[in-house]
From Swiss-Prot:
The species this protein was found in: Homo sapiens (Human)
Identification of the protein by name: Epidermal growth factor-like protein 8
Record-linked PANTHER family: EGF-LIKE-DOMAIN, MULTIPLE 7, 8, EPIDERMAL GROWTH FACTOR-LIKE PROTEIN 8
Lineage: Eukaryota, Metazoa, Chordata, Craniata, Vertebrata
One of the protein's GO biological processes: vasculogenesis
Keyword Signal (UniProt): yes
């Protein structure tokens, strides 16, 4: 199945072609700088791959010439052949400072190392330093902050501490206003712009923990995408006759057409391999997959 794998690899490289051609405003570098990166090195990496090419084959045949004579001539046909190509490409390698690490070996950014994990939604922002979510404190964000015991008046009457937050309460003859902090008589008054904003701020503080975690995950995905795009870009640049940004539309169309032909050839190779795998001789002495001594 080696031929099938080689064909699929070549087709996958051409599929990245249009994505890697920079558009307007794409110049200026795409590698995102980050904290903890002490240096970036450009390494020369050997690249080995198989590429296809058209080999001319001359087929003799007889034809009718002038004077009703039979002449011998030939026609030129082409067949797809494979050859091994060895090239060198440049790749960027990031070196992290002490106390920082890469998420994976090919990452171009570094993240801080905390010997003990940051709890309750905290994020490790520097070596052994956590940035805690609202309502939590301590070196590892393991301490619940009792907002009710601070010097700031958060509730007009009663304050109840909760894990990572607090709630306000009122005496039995009063009701809690829409801001969640002020007590008032009877039914609460229609919400004002200030009270609505206050509630929105509290909701935003609660969502901050989830948002930070999502940003952290998205940064990891971006690093992996940058790595894959860099590898694919190096592969495509190695097999193209000119850099992708110098390709003309007609050249892109031609390469895309070659990709379609390669896909068709790969399907034919797979069909032949399946048929050959089902073949066997009458005495099984030379059948594929059968070894008799």
């Amino acid at each position: 199945m080696g031929s099938r794998a080689e064909l699929c690899t070549l087709l996958g490289g051409f599929s990245f072609l249009l994505l890697l051609i920079p558009g307007e405003g794409a110049k200026g570098g795409s590698l995102r700088e980050s904290q903890g990166v002490c240096s970036k090195q450009t390494l020369v990496v050997p690249l080995h791959y198989n590429e296809s090419y058209s080999q001319p084959v001359y087929k003799p045949y007889l034809t009718l010439c002038a004077g009703r004579r039979i002449c011998s001539t030939y026609r030129t046909m082409y067949r797809v052949m494979w050859r091994e190509v060895r090239r060198e490409v440049q790749q960027t390698h990031a070196v992290c400072c002490q106390g920082w690490k890469k998420r994976h070996p090919g990452a171009l950014t570094c993240e801080a190392i905390c010997a003990k994990p940051c709890l309750n939604g905290g994020v490790c922002v520097r070596p052994d330093q956590c940035e805690c979510a609202p309502g939590w404190g301590g070196k590892h964000c393991h301490v619940d902050v009792d907002e009710c015991r601070t010097s700031i008046t958060l509730c007009s009457h009663h304050c109840f501490n909760t894990a990572g937050s607090f709630t306000c309460g009122c005496p039995h003859d009063l009701v809690l206003g829409v801001d969640g902090r002020t007590c008032m008589e009877g039914s609460p008054e229609p919400p004002t712009s200030a009270s609505i904003l206050s509630v929105a701020v509290r909701e935003a503080e609660k969502d901050e923990r989830a948002l930070k975690q999502e940003i952290h995950e998205l940064r990891g995905r971006l690093e992996r995408l940058e790595q894959w795009a860099g590898q694919a870009g190096a592969w495509v640049r190695a097999v193209l006759p000119v850099p992708p940004e110098e390709l003309q539309p007609e050249q892109v169309a031609e390469l895309w057409g070659r990709g379609d032909r390669i896909e068709s050839l790969s399907d034919q190779v797979l069909l032949l391999e399946e048929r050959l795998g089902a073949c066997s001789c009458e005495d099984n002495s030379l059948g594929l997959g059968v070894n008799h001594r």
